[in-house]
A protein has these predicted regions:
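Active-site glycine-centered loops adjacent to acidic/histidine catalytic or metal-binding residues
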Residues: 57, 84-85, 116-117, 178, ...
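Metal-dependent catalytic neighborhoods of phosphoester/phosphodiester hydrolases
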Residues: 63-68, 86-103, 120-131, 185-190, ...
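Active-site-proximal beta-strand elements of phosphoester/diester hydrolases
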Residues: 49-59, 141-150, 174-176, 227-233
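N-terminal active-site segment of His-dependent metallophosphoesterases
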Residues: 26-97
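The substrate-binding groove and active-site-proximal loops of carbohydrate-active enzymes
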Residues: 55, 86-89, 146-153, 186-189
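Bacterial N-terminal signal peptides
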Residues: 12-22
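His/acidic metal-ligating clusters that form di-metal
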Residues: 45, 70-79, 104-105, 110, ...
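Bacterial N-terminal signal peptides that target proteins for export
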Residues: 2-12
Length: 270
């Protein structure tokens, strides 16, 4: 009976993933193009030593964002993960501009975007990618799970998606979503509905590292034993007052060497 139950859960998770994909994605999105590049890159890099870059909130400052992309490129990353708010209103014109910068500066790097609260969901689904997605590699022992919480809550379908994806274990599992959970340290512009369920799930599954964005600073915390980072300094106006962390333009470079994970915050001058 236990084996049947486990199989049933796997099937349910697979159906859920397909459902999210069919609802949230169309052909020829940035996600699809990047996934093809990533699959090729996974075969090229050494499982013993590879790097990826995380950044977020690039709206309203193309000059800084271009510097951010150029800096990220120098690390020869396996992929770049953008934490959302690539635009102010998510229009097609803004999306054209964003894609032109990405394609012009890092055309060869797989580029994945977590949906933010400034995005237009219709445009995002048609041109950027799904609202929930998972990057997975058995060869690299790597799993990156991105979940939509741009409405300041983690809804039941997203929580179910997250739990399904966490059930498939990898040596290093990362979780990303745009808005940070409310904690004693992070108590402004954060979300509460579903936050306890989120942090419990991450702790119970021994997630390697959680990435959040939205608040335009760099900050670190440990939440129920899970290392957590806010990285939202890719161009949007910095959150100078009232927030924990360092209000600087920056990227986070993640290095996985012999299965051990290290991170480095690298500043960018305006």
């Amino acid at each position: 009976m236990q084996r049947i139950g486990k199989f049933s859960r796997i099937v349910s998770c697979a159906v859920l993933v397909l459902l999210f994909w069919s609802v949230n994605s169309q052909a020829a999105t940035l996600y699809e193009r990047s996934l093809e590049k990533l699959q090729a890159g996974i075969e090229r890099v050494s499982p013993a030593d590879f790097t990826f870059v995380v950044l977020g909130d690039s709206r309203d400052n193309d000059g800084v964002f271009k510097k951010i992309l150029a800096l990220a490129k120098t690390y020869n990353p396996l992929f770049i993960l953008h934490g959302g708010d690539y635009s102010n209103k998510g229009s097609n014109t803004e999306t054209d501009n964003f894609l032109a910068m990405v394609d012009g500066i890092v055309p060869e790097v797989p580029f994945f975007v977590v949906i933010g609260n400034h995005e237009n969901k219709k445009v995002f689904a048609e041109r950027i990618g799904p609202f929930n997605f998972t990057l997975d590699s058995a060869r690299l022992k790597l799993r990156v799970i991105a979940v939509d919480n741009e409405n300041y809550l983690l809804k039941d379908p997203e929580l179910e998606y997250l739990n399904c994806q966490l059930a498939a274990k990898r040596e290093n599992t990362f979780v990303a979503m745009h808005i940070p959970p409310r904690t004693e340290r992070w108590n402004l512009h954060t979300f509460s509905a579903g936050a306890a369920e989120l942090t419990n799930a991450l702790a119970e599954n021994a997630v390697t590292l959680a990435f959040y964005f939205h608040i335009h600073v760099y900050d670190r915390d440990v939440i129920k034993g899970v290392p957590s980072i806010i990285t939202a300094g890719a161009g949007a106006p910095l959150s100078v007052f009232g927030f924990s962390g360092e209000p600087v333009y920056h990227i986070v470079v993640v290095r996985v060497k012999n299965d051990a994970v290290s991170t480095e915050m690298v500043k960018v001058n305006e």
